[in-house]
Amino acid sequence: MSTALLLGFAMLLDAALGEPEWLWSRLRHPAVLIGDIISVLDDELNEGGHRRLKGVAVTAILAVGALSVGALLSLLGPVAEVLICAILLAQKSLAGHVADVADALRLSLPEARRSVARIVSRDTATMSEPQVARAAIESAAENLSDGVIAPAFWFLVGGLPGLLLYKTINTADSMVGYMNERYAQFGWAAARLDDLLNLIPARLTCGMIVLLSNGWRHWRGIVEDAQRHISPNAGWPEAAMARALNIALAGPRSYHGEIRHLAWVNEEGRKEIGPREIERAVTLLWQVWALALGLTLTLVALAAIF
């Protein structure tokens, strides 16, 4: 059975079931287990001298371990591969979390702040309605790439070993890939490898959003905004999403009480936004998913023909 066909089944399974609370309230999710391992390595090794060298070693250990575990799990057969791949995709859960913010925003601003705090790391306690909406839509765009397109891409390229490698390094980056005193050196290798692994998927995500929104006329602006973005990859889907919805994203935000003035993405777009724009972003998430599924099934058909 082809890898593309396995991916197609996994995408459908994830879209249908997502992350059932009844299951993951009883079992440790694989991503949580990966995080537990990274936490132990962080606690044991991220101290004293040679932190960058230690971080490189940890990243190498994680990468080799992920590839090895993926290869072993592949021996369980196609049904297991589909199940594991579906578990490590995040389409339904992402769309659900983002839609929850729109629903909360229609109820009250305090409720919306609590809802968006579940999906972003910035300060949310004093957010205005447009800031809540921007945070939710930015999370939707970035996690569409990180949580759906990139895992699918690496599963296509490398099967379960490729998928587990990506998820492990992406989790490591989310935990230690910060430019602060504790992690600037120790998390350097994980952050750089995550940048590399997301290089193609982020641009694929951008291209699919542009295709679906007929946004080719905005391509130059998308490229300019993406290149100004603080992240070498997240700016691509965010810039495409901003223009697809005709809104401005990014801009000032607060982290740990400190205001950071980030460059606007699509600065000329509408800044006064709310639940309606979040709902349009959720619709676009599902449209990109459907396009990705269609492309995957096209690969299946081409493999059968040739």
Swiss-Prot record:
It is a multi-pass membrane protein. GO terms for molecular function: ABC-type vitamin B12 transporter activity; threonine-phosphate decarboxylase activity. GO terms for biological process: cobalamin biosynthetic process. Keywords: Cell membrane, Cobalamin biosynthesis, Membrane, Transmembrane, Transmembrane helix. Its main location: membrane. The chain crosses the membrane at residues 69-89, 146-166, 286-306. InterPro entries: Cobalamin_biosynth_CobD/CbiB (IPR004485). It is found in: Cell membrane. It holds the Pfam family CobD_Cbib. Pathway: Cofactor biosynthesis; adenosylcobalamin biosynthesis. GO terms for cellular component: plasma membrane. Converts cobyric acid to cobinamide by the addition of aminopropanol on the F carboxylic group. Belongs to the CobD/CbiB family. This is Cobalamin biosynthesis protein CobD. It comes from Ruegeria pomeroyi (strain ATCC 700808 / DSM 15171 / DSS-3) (Silicibacter pomeroyi). The gene is cobD.
